[in-house]
A protein has these predicted regions:
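N-terminal, positively charged/glycine-rich alpha-helical extensions of SAM-dependent methyltransferases
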Residues: 1-27
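Class I SAM-dependent methyltransferase SAM/SAH-binding core
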Residues: 65, 69-113
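Conserved class I S-adenosyl-L-methionine
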Residues: 54-62
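Class I SAM-dependent methyltransferase Rossmann-like catalytic core
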Residues: 21-40
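Conserved alpha-helix/loop element of class I SAM-dependent methyltransferases that forms part
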Residues: 36-52
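A conserved beta-strand element that flanks and buttresses the S-adenosyl-L-methionine
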Residues: 125
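C-terminal alpha-helical "lid/dimerization" subdomain adjacent to the S-adenosyl-L-methionine
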Residues: 157-198, 204-212
Length: 233
C-alpha cells in the first residue's frame, strides 16, 4: 500500500494511490472509484478538524476510507465505523488488515441509527450520509451523533449542497447512477438547528466546490460542561 505520510496535505495527488492500493481485493470499478474519490470528497478540509490521538466514530462509514486514512497518517488512537451495507464493511475490514495500526479500527454492521455503539467519542463524523436518510428520520440521526460526541469533542458533518443549480443536479445524477436513489438534499441550516437543539456549538462552516460538485462542511463542538454529556441514545 502506498501510504501517505503523517504530514500529508491529503490532496488528491497524495491519496489516489493510497486508496487504489487499499482496496486491492475489490472489483476494479470500486478500486478506480476509490482512487478518484479524493478529487471529489474534501478530505483535506475534514482531517484538520480531527485532533491528534482522538477516538473517532464514523457514522455511515461505507468502505472505511476516512478511518483508514486517519490511521495511515497516525492521526487517531481508535476508530469505529458503522454502516447498513455489509458488503461495504467487508471491504473496510479488508482495508484495515493492510494497514499498520489497522487493529485499532472496528467496523460494525447496523440496521438503524439505534444500533450505533453507545459510547462517547472525541470525534463523530458523518460524511455524505444524511441525504440517504428518509427526511422524517434525519433529525433523529443528527441527535444520535450529537449524543455520542464526548464533552469537549466535535461532530463533523459533510454533505452535498442543497442550493439549486448545476452542482446539486450533478450530485442528484451521481446518486441515481451509483446508489439508484432519487435523493432530496439536506438543508445545512436544518442540521445547524438540530445540532443546536442537542447543545452543540457551530465552530466552522464552509462551502467547498470540487469538480462539478458542491459540498457543505459544518463542524460543531460539544461544550465540556454542556447538556447530553453521556451517550444515552
Amino acid at each position: 500500500v502506498r501510504l501517505p505520510s503523517p504530514d500529508t496535505a491529503c490532496t488528491p495527488a497524495d491519496l489516489r494511490g493510497f486508496f487504489y492500493d487499499l482496496y486491492e481485493d475489490a472489483p476494479k470499478p470500486l478500486r478506480l472509484l476509490s482512487a478518484a474519490r479524493p478529487y471529489v470528497c474534501p478530505y483535506d478540509r475534514i482531517v484538520p478538524f480531527v485532533p491528534q490521538g482522538a477516538r473517532v466514530l464514523d457514522v455511515g462509514c461505507g468502505t472505511g476510507a476516512l478511518l483508514a486514512l486517519l490511521v495511515a497518517i497516525e492521526r487517531i488512537a481508535e476508530g469505529v465505523g458503522c454502516d447498513v451495507s455489509a458488503p461495504a464493511l467487508s471491504f473496510a475490514r479488508g482495508a484495515a488488515g493492510r494497514l499498520a495500526g489497522g487493529e485499532r479500527l472496528r467496523f460494525d454492521h447496523i440496521e438503524t441509527i439505534d444500533g450505533v455503539v453507545d459510547a462517547p467519542f472525541d470525534v463523530v463524523v458523518m460524511v455524505d450520509v444524511l441525504h440517504h436518510v428518509p427526511e422524517a428520520e434525519r433529525q433523529k440521526v443528527v441527535a444520535a451523533a450529537a449524543r455520542r460526541t464526548a464533552p469537549g469533542g466535535v461532530f463533523i458533518y459533510k454533505d452535498m449542497t442543497d442550493e439549486p443549480g448545476g452542482r446539486r443536479l450533478a450530485h442528484t445524477i451521481d446518486d441515481l447512477i451509483f446508489s439508484h436513489e432519487l435523493v432530496r438534499q439536506v438543508s445545512p441550516e436544518a442540521v445547524e438547528h438540530w445540532a443546536a437543539g442537542e447543545g452543540l456549538e457551530l465552530v466552522a462552516s464552509e462551502y467547498l466546490p470540487r469538480l462539478v460538485y458542491g459540498h457543505v462542511l459544518r463542524v460543531f463542538r460539544k461544550p465540556a460542561d454542556g447538556p447530553n454529556a453521556g451517550a444515552d441514545a
